[in-house]
């Protein structure tokens, strides 16, 4: 079996899937170069979107704010208020499925569904913190113009719309009020804002990283040449999922062509929760075509479909558990087949941890903070994949520490809390 594993590793190297091709420091250098170009507004795969939102100074005590969180899969609504110690209180929390996940919708149907989700809390505040987790061009009035819907959401006629204005219009159509003050932000900005709560220890600057259905990051920036030069510190969103990684190979490119939006968000498709499971199945099929696994197992793999990232995480942790969906979907019983599959999945998990760490590290480095004990960078981490995939998270954090602290002397700490996106959206909605 050792020979089989060695041959499998060689095949993954040839396909540019093996983690050895993805050195974290090299990746960070590439990302930082693209970030600089994006801030200048020229020739970058990273949007580097200014948000016109800065860190919170004072959070109003006791004032309610409505929060709407439109993510890659789930739609959440709630009412949030902060007590005198800065602690958030989340009330009336309701979770639904995002419109466009189960069936295609048009623009009106999409925003009507969002407005309907606020019916229970619409009369309790005139302020809305609207977290919309898709690429937007942010406006000085804190609305956001959608660049492109993604994460496999099926919604036609929505690209190019001002999402805050569309939400207000939908709420008026539903008889849910007229005068609304809406602040639009995405999930990474919301996570960063949550980390600015005064209850946290002192810090020099802020960044945030999201690894859920999708992937993104943001940080505080004051030097934005495309806005005309130095500005007051504000959150800049990388749109990191769109990074055009020069190290990406044909296996990833072939997988991208199977997705709903080929050519877009190609970095995200290498490791985010919405794609890691399907990518793993794609890699197993690639290996089956190369002659790996027993004949019976090759047949089962090539006929299989429907693996999710949660299935991959469970198999990676417990490969000998025959009750797991991964084992059942692939009808995998032979121990040699199990060992080969686990080795391939482990390569993808290690690569994912390096890709994730590269984005986190680049955002932290770009804050230009953390070089003395009083200026540590607070990095808020959020996302279902990051928190539930324990081994991926542990490896990512090890790579992050090795690069930032051991090699570069940058002090940072990771911030995590329940409902970070809801809390951060509430803070933004109150500013």
Residue ranges and their predicted role:
Residues 87-90, 152-158, 190-281, 285:
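Glycine-rich phosphate-binding loop of actin/hexokinase-like ATP-binding domains
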Residues 79-81, 131-134, 186, 210-212, ...:
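Glycine-rich, histidine-containing beta strand-loop boundary motifs that form or position
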Residues 95-112, 136-200, 204-207, 228-247, ...:
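Glycine-rich phosphate-binding loop and adjoining helix at the ATP-binding site
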Residues 19-53, 183, 207-210, 224, ...:
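Small-residue (GG/TT-enriched) beta-loop-alpha framework at ligand/catalytic clefts
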Residues 75, 135-139, 215-218, 245:
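Short, acidic Gly/Pro/Ser/Thr-rich loop/turn segments
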Residues 63-69, 127-129, 181-183, 206-210, ...:
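Short glycine-aspartate micro-motif
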Residues 1-93, 102-126, 172, 197-198, ...:
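ATP-binding/phosphotransfer module of carbohydrate and carboxylate kinases, centering on a glycine-rich
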Residues 133-138, 188-191, 383-387, 419-421:
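Short, internal active-site loops enriched in acidic
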């Amino acid at each position: 079996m050792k020979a089989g594993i060695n041959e499998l590793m060689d095949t993954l190297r040839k396909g540019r899937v093996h983690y050895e091709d993805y050195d974290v420091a090299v990746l960070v250098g590439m990302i930082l170069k693209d970030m600089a170009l994006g801030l200048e507004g020229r020739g970058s795969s990273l949007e580097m979107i200014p948000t016109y939102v800065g860190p919170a100074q004072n959070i109003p005590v006791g004032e309610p704010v409505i929060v709407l969180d439109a993510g890659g899969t789930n739609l959440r609504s709630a009412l949030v208020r902060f007590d005198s110690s800065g602690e958030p209180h989340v009330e009336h929390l309701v979770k639904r499925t995002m419109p466009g996940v189960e069936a295609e919708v048009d623009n009106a149907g999409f925003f009507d569904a969002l407005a309907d989700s606020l019916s229970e809390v619409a009369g309790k505040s005139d302020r809305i913190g609207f977290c919309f987790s898709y690429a937007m061009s942010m406006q000085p009035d804190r609305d956001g113009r959608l660049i492109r819907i993604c994460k496999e959401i099926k919604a036609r006629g929505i690209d190019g719309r001002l999402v805050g204005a569309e939400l207000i219009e939908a709420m008026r159509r539903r008889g849910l009020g007229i005068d609304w003050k809406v602040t639009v932000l995405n999930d990474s900005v919301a996570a960063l804002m949550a980390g600015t709560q005064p209850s946290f220890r002192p810090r020099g600057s802020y960044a945030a990283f999201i690894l859920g259905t999708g992937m993104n990051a943001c940080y505080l920036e004051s030097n934005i040449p495309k806005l005309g030069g130095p500005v007051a510190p504000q959150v800049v969103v990388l749109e990191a999922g769109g990074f055009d990684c020069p190290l990406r190979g044909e296996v990833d490119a072939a997988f991208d062509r199977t997705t709903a939006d080929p050519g877009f968000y190609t970095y995200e498709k290498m490791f985010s929760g919405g794609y890691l499971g399907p990518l793993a199945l794609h890699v197993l099929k690639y290996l089956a075509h190369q002659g790996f696994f027993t004949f019976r197992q090759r047949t089962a793999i090539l006929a299989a479909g429907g693996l999710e990232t949660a299935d991959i995480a469970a198999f990676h942790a417990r490969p000998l558990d025959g009750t797991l969906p991964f084992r059942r979907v692939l009808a995998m019983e032979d121990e040699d087949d199990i060992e080969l599959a686990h080795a391939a999945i482990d390569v993808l998990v290690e690569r994912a941890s390096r890709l994730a760490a590269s984005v986190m590290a680049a955002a932290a480095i770009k804050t230009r903070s953390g070089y003395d004990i009083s200026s540590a960078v607070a990095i808020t981490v959020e996302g279902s994949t990051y928190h539930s995939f324990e081994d991926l998270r542990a490896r990512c954090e090890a790579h992050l520490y090795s690069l930032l602290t051991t090699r570069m002397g940058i002090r940072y700490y990771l911030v995590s809390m329940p409902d970070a996106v809801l809390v951060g959206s509430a803070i933004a909605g109150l500013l």
